[in-house]
Curated annotation (Swiss-Prot):
GO terms for cellular component: cytoplasm; DNA-directed RNA polymerase complex. Pfam families: RNA_pol_A_bac, RNA_pol_A_CTD, RNA_pol_L. The gene is rpoA. The N-terminal domain is essential for RNAP assembly and basal transcription, whereas the C-terminal domain is involved in interaction with transcriptional regulators and with upstream promoter elements. InterPro entries: DNA-dir_RNA_pol_insert, DNA-dir_RNA_pol_RpoA/D/Rpb3, DNA-dir_RpoA, RBP11-like, RNAP_asu_C, RNApol_insert_sf. It is an enzyme of class 2 (transferase). This is DNA-directed RNA polymerase subunit alpha. Homodimer. The RNAP catalytic core consists of 2 alpha, 1 beta, 1 beta' and 1 omega subunit. When a sigma factor is associated with the core the holoenzyme is formed, which can initiate transcription. Coiled coil: none annotated. Signal peptide: none annotated. Belongs to the RNA polymerase alpha chain family. One of its GO terms (molecular function) is protein dimerization activity. It catalyses: RNA(n) + a ribonucleoside 5'-triphosphate = RNA(n+1) + diphosphate.
Length: 333
């Protein structure tokens, strides 16, 4: 295989805003590779990066999303919309797959924001947008709400999250006695914007070469270097399956395929499983025929010649073999 020019990957310092908004450059790429790589990375960045988001809430004395709450300006639906925008710093050392994380708001503050959200079981969890307004309390009673988070990627509708609540209700550990769990949509994408730019570059090469610029802005939950690395790893994992043709079983980045039950071969079936008469079974066993595979070596003439097998017994055996879609040769004419 003809070798390609070694490429370089770097951050464009002049276009850097912070860890969560910057631009990366890859060059030199052979003609066409800029668009190919850029499009694949962009789609993966927008759809397949892991993060942690809310999937359910529980408000004291609230049973459905159409309720209103005494002294609270916002209705329940508006509160749910606000909660969806709570962003947590995603740290793989803190958050585990298939685990539920409970946040609690209990305050008499007039302006209730995401900074009022506390994690009793996981105090190390950090909130990105602490000034996000959740609700307005015009009364003296405390506003009490629990928010439940989990790890995932892509998008999950509130209907699917309803099912998740039913499955995980025992793990939610709610301390609110009056009120019901309400599901909300989960948009896991930590990316706000991805812009891909491809242009030709002047070089000493005789071939036309390109540079690829990828501008990324996240929601502040994961830094841009990490999500770009994660996107590349996802693509590599898929392409490795194609490239590593001789060692497909060694690729373990995908979920394990459920093992299908393998039916035993009919050749290994014991003759006692054929539901034959005792006379027929004994006659066959005396001649050393204990498996269906043994019988399949015989012709009909051989079967007739077996000692103590009468005409009816032979017909019985032939009929049973037909149930296994097996027929014996008739023998020499």
């Amino acid at each position: 295989m003809k070798k390609m020019v070694q490429i370089k990957y770097k951050e464009v310092k002049t276009k850097r805003v912070n860890d969560y908004e910057t631009t990366f450059k890859i060059e030199p790429l052979e003609r066409g590779f800029g668009s190919t790589i850029g499009t694949a990375l962009r789609r993966t960045l927008l759809s397949s990066i892991t993060s942690v988001v809310p999937f359910a809430i529980k408000i004291k004395d609230v049973d459905q999303e159409f309720d209103t709450i005494s002294d609270i300006v916002e209705d329940v639906q508006m509160i749910m919309l606000n909660v969806k925008n709570i962003h947590l710093v995603y740290d793989e050392n803190i958050f585990e797959d298939n685990k539920i994380y409970r946040g609690v708001i209990e305050t008499k503050n007039e302006k209730i924001t995401s900074s009022d959200l506390k994690f009793p079981e996981n105090p190390e969890i950090e909130i990105v947008n602490k000034d996000l307004e959740i609700a307005t309390n015009n009364g003296q009673k405390p506003f009490v709400m629990e928010v439940y988070f989990h790890v995932g990627r892509g998008y999950i509708s509130f209907e699917d999250n309803k099912k998740l609540i039913e499955e995980k209700v025992a793990l939610l550990n709610s301390t609110i006695k009056r009120g019901k769990f309400l599901a909300i949509d989960s948009d896991f994408s930590p990316v706000e914007k991805v812009k891909v730019k491809v242009q030709e570059i002047n070089s000493s090469s005789l071939n036309i070469e390109e540079e690829l610029e990828i501008e990324i802005k996240t929601k502040g939950t994961i830094d841009t270097k990490n999500i770009l690395s994660q996107a590349a790893q996802i693509l590599i994992a898929h392409l490795q399956v194609i490239g590593d043709v001789k060692n497909l079983d060694a690729v373990d980045v995908f979920e394990q395929k459920k093992q299908e039950k393998v039916e035993p071969s009919i050749h290994s079936v014991d003759i006692t499983s054929l539901d034959l008469s005792v006379r027929s079974i004994n006659a066959l066993k005396r001649q050393g025929y204990t498996k269906l595979a043994d019988i399949l070596t015989l012709t009909e003439d051989d079967l007739v010649a077996v000692k103590n097998l009468g005409k009816k017994s032979v017909e019985e055996i032939i009929q049973k073999l037909k149930e296994y879609n097996v027929t014996l040769n008739r023998g020499e004419k």
